[in-house]
């Protein structure tokens, strides 16, 4: 079994999938760290909702966000090795969720104040983390 640590010291750098190294303050590291934070925020929302449909959406989105994080954590060689990259089907999936929500709730004409219930508040936190990741 391999270890999660390398014992080589990092000198302020981290390895990308594919073998190259980048500074830990690079935009890629910041981006995939924020994506990881968004995945965790969605996990909190998942535990707080009772809706099987919302749970299914969240779980699917979390899995695809792991893929997005992997892409951000890859160099060119790593990208060639990755399978199942983020693509048009992922965009369509999200658009379908938005369309269904709009059918049920109508178009939003004003800002929604977070905090109606715990799961809604958690989803708003996740939304803000995702916006930062964008």
List each model region and its residues.
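Phosphate/pyrophosphate-binding loop motifs in nucleotide- or prenyl diphosphate-using proteins
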Residues: 1-134
